[in-house]
Curated annotation (Swiss-Prot):
Gene Ontology BP terms: proton motive force-driven ATP synthesis; proton transmembrane transport
Record organism: Rhopalosiphum padi (Bird cherry-oat aphid)
Compartment list: Mitochondrion inner membrane
Quaternary structure and interacting proteins, as annotated: Component of the ATP synthase complex composed at least of ATP5F1A/subunit alpha, ATP5F1B/subunit beta, ATP5MC1/subunit c (homooctomer), MT-ATP6/subunit a, MT-ATP8/subunit 8, ATP5ME/subunit e, ATP5MF/subunit f, ATP5MG/subunit g, ATP5MK/subunit k, ATP5MJ/subunit j, ATP5F1C/subunit gamma, ATP5F1D/subunit delta, ATP5F1E/subunit epsilon, ATP5PF/subunit F6, ATP5PB/subunit b, ATP5PD/subunit d, ATP5PO/subunit OSCP.
Similarity comment text for this entry: Belongs to the ATPase A chain family.
Role noted for this protein: Subunit a, of the mitochondrial membrane ATP synthase complex (F(1)F(0) ATP synthase or Complex V) that produces ATP from ADP in the presence of a proton gradient across the membrane which is generated by electron transport complexes of the respiratory chain. ATP synthase complex consist of a soluble F(1) head domain - the catalytic core - and a membrane F(1) domain - the membrane proton channel. These two domains are linked by a central stalk rotating inside the F(1) region and a stationary peripheral stalk.
Membrane topology: Multi-pass membrane protein
Gene this protein is translated from: MT-ATP6
InterPro entries: ATP_synth_F0_asu (IPR000568), ATP_synth_F0_asu_AS (IPR023011), ATP_synth_F0_asu_bact/mt (IPR045083), F0_ATP_A_sf (IPR035908)
Protein name stated in the entry: ATP synthase F(0) complex subunit a
Length: 217
């Protein structure tokens, strides 16, 4: 019997006394589609459809040509998070995306990159963005502080949203882990598995879309 529900997030996998837990994040390399086939298979077709959908949505955010849009960067981010979320649902695979260090490691570099880029390339618009349009002059200092704080906490809000939703789903599946062959129990567990797959997809989409939205501002 599990005495601590959070034990599911800290398995220990060692080879030659080396911690191998985070190697699971590299499993996505084995599942990326190859282009050696004359006719695309179903996996390629599904991924291309997903790429086109995300690319069209992000192009509307940036309002620029495909050749100049950084949409491919966020599509890669989406696929990386999505596959890690899916792998974390399999037994005996380390749930890397349920750890705060995983989401923070992705959110902060993206945030810093676009903050530095916008500051260097478009300094005036970056500073003007700190004060919303039609703000009274006496509220300008306060609004500047509020907007600055909202920009600073963006990577943490992205990280917490992703981690908290995945942790909640894993804990709920652990609580409903009954060793029973009753039909109702099996249907409940199947429903929870489908629900977790949907959560993994939605959270990956939200993380990548919000990252692109923050960068477009």
């Amino acid at each position: 019997m599990t005495t601590n529900l959070f034990n599911i997030f800290d398995p220990s996998t060692t080879i030659f006394n080396l911690e191998m837990n985070w190697i699971s994040t590299l499993l996505i390399i084995l599942f990326m589609p190859n282009f050696l086939w004359i006719l695309p298979n179903r996996m390629n077709w599904l991924l291309f459809k997903m790429f086109n959908m995300l690319n069209n949505e992000m192009l509307m955010l940036y309002k620029m040509k495909k050749t100049k849009s950084p949409a491919f960067l966020f599509i890669s981010l989406f696929m990386f998070i999505l596959l890690n979320n899916f792998f974390s649902l399999f037994p005996y695979i380390f749930s890397s995306s349920s750890h705060m260090v995983f989401s923070v490691t992705l959110a902060i570099p993206f945030w810093m990159f676009f903050i530095i880029l916008s500051t260097c390339k478009n300094t005036k618009n970056m500073i003007a963005h700190l004060i919303p349009l039609n703000t009274p002059i006496y509220l300008a200092p306060l609004m500047t502080i509020i907007e600055t704080m909202s920009i600073i906490i963006r990577p943490m809000s992205l990280s917490i949203r992703l981690t908290a939703n995945l942790i909640a789903g894993h804990l709920l599946m652990t609580l409903l882990n009954f060793n029973s062959l009753m039909i109702i129990i099996i249907f409940i567990q199947m429903f929870m598995m489908i629900f977790e797959l949907c959560v993994a997809l939605i959270q990956s989409y939200v993380f990548s879309i919000l990252s692109s939205l923050y960068s477009s501002e």
